[in-house]
């Protein structure tokens, strides 16, 4: 491709509305342009990287036995009402009516559509296992779209759906997709983790997220420094206390704590560490239920864990008025002792290892010291409620410690079980002629989001540093003086030789200053660059620059071509 005939509208200045590096660089590199909030045009350079990633995804999906198809973006409301998600999904679901007053939505995902197709077409156990996938445009009406392709409203996604005769077979399909995802992100040259995750609005029994590690990542994840355990912080398990404390239980005492409403204030006032305190938090459901959660004062409540253990769809912090009505206690002095009848208390597992703790006395300006579980207060149930922290012991191995990372979610796989097949009546006849419900899995990858995440992980002050498998071009050939016929002839010859060997080359034949060409080539992130100038040619040399390392090589034109071809082929071979 000749640069002068291509369309790469680079920008020198960083757009003021671009908050994260990938958004800034994709705009500056001429890869995308905003059409409306969260909706983007993919310009030629950006589309090349998108197509590169799609090709890797297709190869691995096909290798894993998945079958490509394409479903409509527009979906009828009836299917979503059958699954129960029409009212549950919320305002992210873009709904509209056609001229006949029929209700529809723009698909944010396709569980209902694919299950509807399967219930019509698959009737026998002999037709399974089967796995369908598509690469499709989705739409989710995000309340605050931002970060470019990282959190847009319209986006490209690969989604796959597996159908099996039973749970064991579904586990096998899940493992096939898990391994396919591992290969996909390994082939892209990305530093990533596969982590245990919450199933969220999709539902199902278990799931894994695939996280590209980046300091700018919105998600907090943990991994063990000794074993392979890794999880999103929403899902990460804390290791239970070894057992009840052996510390001697002291006499319970009520003490004044005037205007000390926070854990930090109470601990400081009493001259104790915050890990000697217990905090109480009250939450409510959308149906008016309430619960008190208690945990160590230095720990943070994980609301996802609380919601899941209660089986509630949503939870929210109770208002001061709700807390007073439910517990009879003023805010700031809540505790698990002396509560009104009917108050449900859920305790974190770590409390089993505490003794002589400080708790709220359910009375203004008063706390108890030396409160002990079992003797002074009880809990209706004990569950893992807290967020894990860096340095916590690993829940899966002995001696391992948890490390904290920031990550960008680029893929998610779910064991759905019978959630959708049961709701939509997707059944089959087994070998005995009996009707059974189909077991499902679903598997998503954000296409544009992965390209953006690759940029978040791979960039410097000069621009993008694309991993070679995702780069729009493998190599650029830069002619320094386009008016020098010898330079142009040598550069053109190298360009055509590389193309003939399957190398994707951008020939920078523009009549621009060398500095402009170098800046643009660095900005758009092409991994390899050959610089052809009159001075070098007079010595029989050209310059090869490796973008990621900054290494420069002075080689003959023949050596340069051989080096580029070898590096590209090595990268492609290792990725496969």
From Swiss-Prot:
Keyword Cytoplasm: yes
Superkingdom, taxonomy of origin: Bacteria
Enzymatic reactions: tRNA(Pro) + L-proline + ATP = L-prolyl-tRNA(Pro) + AMP + diphosphate
Xref: PROSITE patterns: AA_TRNA_LIGASE_II (PS50862)
Main subcellular location of this protein, as a coarse class: cytoplasm
Biological process annotations from GO: prolyl-tRNA aminoacylation
Record's GO cellular component terms: cytosol
InterPro entries given in the database record: aa-tRNA-synt_IIb, aa-tRNA-synth_II, aa-tRNA-synth_II/BPL/LPL, Anticodon-bd, Anticodon-bd_dom_sf, Pro-tRNA-ligase_IIa, Pro-tRNA-synth_IIa_bac-type, Pro-tRNA-Synthase_IIa_type1
Record comment regarding domains: Consists of three domains: the N-terminal catalytic domain, the editing domain and the C-terminal anticodon-binding domain.
Function, as annotated: Catalyzes the attachment of proline to tRNA(Pro) in a two-step reaction: proline is first activated by ATP to form Pro-AMP and then transferred to the acceptor end of tRNA(Pro). As ProRS can inadvertently accommodate and process non-cognate amino acids such as alanine and cysteine, to avoid such errors it has two additional distinct editing activities against alanine. One activity is designated as 'pretransfer' editing and involves the tRNA(Pro)-independent hydrolysis of activated Ala-AMP.
Family per record: Belongs to the class-II aminoacyl-tRNA synthetase family. ProS type 1 subfamily.
Protein name according to UniProt: Proline--tRNA ligase
Species: Pelobacter propionicus (strain DSM 2379 / NBRC 103807 / OttBd1)
Phylogenetic classification of the source organism: Bacteria, Pseudomonadati, Thermodesulfobacteriota, Desulfuromonadia, Desulfuromonadales
